[in-house]
């Protein structure tokens, strides 16, 4: 059994940053050359990248487009992109520019037909972002919390043909508290869609804890701060993830 490790590049003002609990005022800058960071992840063996336009998530439109395009050109593997993609034009634009999969978060809650239509016409290319605070779906760059439960959101797209669900425990994101394996696996077992774990990965132990659940529907795991802070070695994480 194996899972995918997605090293994360979060963009704010063209820089590589990590936030604590999705708070834009608690951003740590890790570099000002996103394309170079993408190359370094590729050299360590990464086949996928998880890229988020943080400014875009709050603005509802692409803000760090130049940096994203530079990453796509620099990274030889596959890129999944989220942040501010809320209409079909945005989806089509990024796929045409070389993004492999597009993550729809806020729009999945507000405009589910967009997700259904795109997933039907673009099989394997649409990921639904399930960002959770205390079991409820958070939207608009995690600044707002809805009354929709995470399993309710998953159920809405059970037969839509989306590639996967990206489950982020917002309360752990960027805090190195450890991945919420229990909640992630519970969602994967409930849903008929593969699940990517995100939020709180602190060490190789978090990767190892998820690998046995590949059979439950865990497709992969996203890691950011642990890599940037040197707590997690990407090459080792990739090796462990291969089972």
From Swiss-Prot:
- Keyword field: Amino-acid biosynthesis, Cytoplasm, Histidine biosynthesis, Isomerase
Q: What class of enzyme is it?
A: isomerase
- Catalytic center at which residues? 10, 131
Where in or outside the cell it occurs: the entry states: Cytoplasm
Name the catalysed reactions.
Answer: 1-(5-phospho-beta-D-ribosyl)-5-[(5-phospho-beta-D-ribosylamino)methylideneamino]imidazole-4-carboxamide = 5-[(5-phospho-1-deoxy-D-ribulos-1-ylimino)methylamino]-1-(5-phospho-beta-D-ribosyl)imidazole-4-carboxamide
**Cross-referenced InterPro entries:** Aldolase_TIM, His_biosynth, HisA_bact_arch, Isoase_HisA-like, Isoase_HisA-like_bact, RibuloseP-bd_barrel
- Enzyme Commission identifier(s): 5.3.1.16
Which pathway is this protein engaged in? Amino-acid biosynthesis; L-histidine biosynthesis; L-histidine from 5-phospho-alpha-D-ribose 1-diphosphate: step 4/9
- Principal subcellular localisation of the protein: cytoplasm
- Tell me a GO cellular component: cytoplasm
| Gene Ontology molecular function, alphabetical | 1-(5-phosphoribosyl)-5-[(5-phosphoribosylamino)methylideneamino]imidazole-4-carboxamide isomerase activity
Which GO BP terms apply?
L-histidine biosynthetic process; L-tryptophan biosynthetic process
Q: Which SUPFAM superfamilies match?
A: Ribulose-phoshate binding barrel
Q: What Pfam families does the annotation carry?
A: His_biosynth
On the tree of life, the source organism's domain of life is Bacteria
Q: Which family does it belong to?
A: Belongs to the HisA/HisF family.
Question: What HAMAP family does the record point to?
Answer: HisA (MF_01014)
Matching entries from NCBIfam families are given as:
1-(5-phosphoribosyl)-5-[(5-phosphoribosylamino)methylideneamino]imidazole-4-carboxamide isomerase, PRK13585.1
Name of the featured protein: 1-(5-phosphoribosyl)-5-[(5-phosphoribosylamino)methylideneamino] imidazole-4-carboxamide isomerase
Q: What organism is this sequence from?
A: Rhizorhabdus wittichii (strain DSM 6014 / CCUG 31198 / JCM 15750 / NBRC 105917 / EY 4224 / RW1)
Gene (UniProt): hisA
């Amino acid at each position: 059994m194996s899972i995918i490790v997605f090293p994360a590049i979060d963009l704010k003002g063209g820089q590589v940053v990590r936030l604590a609990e999705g708070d834009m005022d608690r951003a740590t800058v890790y570099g000002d050359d996103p394309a170079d960071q993408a190359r370094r992840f590729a050299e360590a063996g990464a086949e996928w990248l998880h890229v988020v336009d943080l400014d875009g998530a709050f603005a509802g439109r692409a803000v760090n487009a130049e940096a994203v395009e530079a990453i796509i050109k620099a990274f030889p593997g596959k890129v999944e992109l989220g942040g501010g993609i809320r209409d079909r034009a945005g989806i089509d634009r990024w796929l045409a520019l070389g993004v492999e999969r597009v993550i729809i978060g806020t729009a999945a809650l507000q405009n589910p037909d967009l997700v259904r239509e795109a997933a039907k016409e673009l099989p394997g290319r649409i990921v639904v972002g399930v960002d959770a605070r205390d079991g409820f779906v958070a939207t608009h760059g995690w600044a707002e919390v809805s009354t929709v439960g995470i399993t309710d959101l998953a159920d809405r797209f059970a037969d839509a043909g989306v590639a996967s669900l990206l489950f982020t425990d917002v309360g752990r994101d960027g805090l190195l508290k450890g991945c919420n394996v229990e909640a992630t696996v519970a969602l994967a077992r409930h849903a008929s869609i593969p699940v990517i774990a995100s939020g709180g990965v602190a060490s190789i132990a978090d990767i190892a804890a998820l690998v046995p659940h590949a059979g439950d529907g865990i497709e992969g795991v996203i890691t950011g701060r642990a890599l940037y802070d040197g707590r997690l070695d990407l090459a080792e994480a990739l090796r462990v993830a291969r089972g």
